[in-house]
Amino acid sequence: MGLELVTSGKNLPEEINVVIEIPKDSEPVKYEVDKASGAIFVDRILSTPMRYPCNYGYVPNTLCGDGDPADVLVVLPLPLVPGSVVRCRPVGVLRMSDEAGSDEKILAVPIEKIFSGYAHIEDIDQVSSHWMERIGHFFEHYKDLEKGKWVKLDGWGGAAEAKRILVESVERYNSDAP
């Protein structure tokens, strides 16, 4: 099944659709969904023996400055199946850069209908410091043993910044569409 029919979300930027590529606590394998076919490809095996601290995916029909769809970290105590789509609310953004340039990660929680445990979270300051520390540690170190690769964390931004990034990424996608 191709994912081209999955929208960015019904009420963007307040609610977004996230296509899961990597489940929370999965082995150190980086998967990527092929946007045209929907097939899940192994991108690479991470050199560090680290597990992803949360579900990792992207928002369809978005395009960020790095040429990829908007990356999303879905905070949830359970792993989700790669290729599944989960409706979320953006609550913050991890500002970071790597050897390829700027590479922000939107932090999101599932909508209340999917998981009511995070219904109270509206902005980054309401996310547990434990979650934020785990996420920051993972992304600061997951490329440590890969030659020529590096990551620099540039801090956290709130929900308003995350929503601005999402709106800009949809506009960029639409302006680049044939």
UniProtKB/Swiss-Prot annotation:
InterPro entries: Pyrophosphatase, Pyrophosphatase_sf
Residues the entry annotates as binding Mg(2+) 2: D71
Keyword Magnesium found: yes
EC number of this enzyme: 3.6.1.1
Gene Ontology cellular-component annotations: cytosol
Transmembrane residue ranges: none
Pfam family, one: Pyrophosphatase
GO biological process, one term: phosphate-containing compound metabolic process
Job of this protein: Catalyzes the hydrolysis of inorganic pyrophosphate (PPi) forming two phosphate ions.
Known partners and oligomeric status: Homohexamer.
Protein's UniProt name: Inorganic pyrophosphatase
Organism this protein belongs to: Xanthomonas campestris pv. campestris (strain ATCC 33913 / DSM 3586 / NCPPB 528 / LMG 568 / P 25)
Gene: ppa
